[in-house]
């Protein structure tokens, strides 16, 4: 018989209360706690933080102390009063002024992903995403559901921008891409990977190919100082002619779709691709036995509740890519969240 002191019960409680940890993080970001502390000339007490974020002193104190335990804040006591400031972690990832800020990603996950995950049991029963149950939006056209308002589309694109601000370099240097001077980022949204390509491979040019509403949002809300090297082109990669390129980048694209749609897209790329050209697939790869990594398994469940796809093993991607005609399959586990696959025509 287990007891409240055994390791199994403690682990169960850690899992059970995991959603509370996420909500502490989401709430502190939404309230602007980390931004307020970043802008302050020194550590702030509870009263100053509560006033700055327009919240109750009682609730603010509870939130701040929990953030300390989560190593998101640090605290010092002076004359019996607690003063709080950001840690290196929160300064790097949870303040809007940081170049590696993840604030928009957390905002998106806290409002959209978290809502869909509340219907995980329904998603498992039905085998489909939960936009209709969560937001009342039909998901027959997946990205009409994902981009269900201008605000949601911008939030999603800002989240992608932040993902690649941290993860772009590791996947774009997994292989030497200097032999591909003309690149096309299919579904490249805000152009974050395109900019990283220019930084890593001087002299290359990148076309960002995405649906018209995404391209319009990108032009309105994201800066493109490298206008001659980055071209934004409107189109649907499932049906419109694809831009000419030496390398096509599919970053977090294939995991959105079932195998049939993936095969259709890959065949379209193959027929457009020049001999010797290739595809760089960027995804979080499951181990071959599908028993891990845990984060990738969770991402695969996220694909269930939010998309039509799943995360896959290297062998699964090999099957999809080789069936479309590609050869010279290589994959590399980067040690970061996302991995890379390179194939050629």
UniProtKB/Swiss-Prot annotation:
Substrate binds at residues 256, 302, 306. Pathway: Aromatic compound metabolism; melatonin biosynthesis; melatonin from serotonin: step 1/2. S-adenosyl-L-methionine binds at residues 147, 164, 210, 235-237, 252. Keywords: Lipid metabolism, Melatonin biosynthesis, Methyltransferase, S-adenosyl-L-methionine, Transferase. Induction: No night/day variations. Gene3D superfamilies: Vaccinia Virus protein VP39, Winged helix-like DNA-binding domain superfamily/Winged helix DNA-binding domain. Its EC number is 2.1.1.4. SUPFAM superfamilies: S-adenosyl-L-methionine-dependent methyltransferases, Winged helix' DNA-binding domain. Highly expressed in pineal gland. In the retina, 10- to 100-fold lower expression compared to pineal gland, if any. CDD domains: AdoMet_MTases. Pfam families: Dimerisation, Methyltransf_2. GO terms for biological process: lipid metabolic process; melatonin biosynthetic process; methylation. The keyword Lipid metabolism applies. It comes from the Eukaryota. One of its GO terms (molecular function) is acetylserotonin O-methyltransferase activity. Homodimer. Catalyzes the transfer of a methyl group onto N-acetylserotonin, producing melatonin (N-acetyl-5-methoxytryptamine). This is Acetylserotonin O-methyltransferase. It comes from Macaca mulatta (Rhesus macaque).
């Amino acid at each position: 018989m287990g007891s409240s002191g055994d390791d199994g019960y403690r682990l169960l409680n850690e899992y059970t209360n995991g959603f509370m940890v996420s909500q502490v993080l989401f709430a502190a970001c939404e309230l602007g706690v980390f931004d307020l502390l970043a802008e302050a000339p020194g550590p702030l007490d509870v009263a100053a933080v509560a006033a700055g974020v327009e919240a109750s002193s009682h609730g603010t104190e509870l939130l701040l102390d929990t953030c300390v335990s989560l190593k998101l804040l640090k605290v010092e006591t002076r004359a019996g009063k607690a003063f709080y400031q950001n840690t290196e972690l929160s300064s790097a990832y949870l303040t809007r002024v940081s170049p590696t800020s993840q604030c928009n990603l957390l905002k998106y996950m806290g409002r959209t992903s978290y809502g869909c995950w509340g219907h995980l049991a329904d998603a498992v029963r039905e085998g489909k995403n939960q936009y209709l149950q969560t937001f009342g939006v039909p998901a027959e056209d997946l990205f009409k559901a994902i981009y269900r308002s201008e605000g949601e589309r911008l939030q999603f694109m800002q989240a992608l921008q932040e993902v690649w601000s941290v993860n772009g370099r590791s996947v774009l240097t997994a292989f030497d891409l200097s032999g591909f001077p003309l690149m096309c980022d299919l579904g490249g949204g805000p152009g974050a990977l395109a900019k990283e390509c220019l930084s890593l491979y001087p002299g290359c040019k990148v076309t960002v190919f995405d649906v018209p509403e995404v391209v319009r949002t990108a032009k309105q809300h994201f800066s493109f100082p490298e206008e001659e090297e980055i071209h934004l082109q409107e189109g649907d990669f499932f049906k419109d002619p694809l831009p000419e390129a030496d390398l096509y980048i599919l970053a977090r694209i294939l995991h959105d779709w079932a195998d049939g749609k993936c095969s259709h897209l890959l065949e379209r790329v193959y027929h457009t691709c020049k001999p010797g050209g290739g595809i760089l697939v960027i995804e979080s790869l499951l181990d071959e036995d599908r028993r891990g990594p845990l984060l990738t398994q969770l991402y695969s469940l996220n694909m269930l509740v939010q998309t039509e796809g799943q995360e896959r093993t290297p062998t699964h991607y090999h099957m999809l890519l080789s069936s479309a005609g590609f050869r010279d399959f290589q994959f590399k586990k980067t040690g970061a969240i996302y991995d890379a696959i390179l194939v050629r025509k």
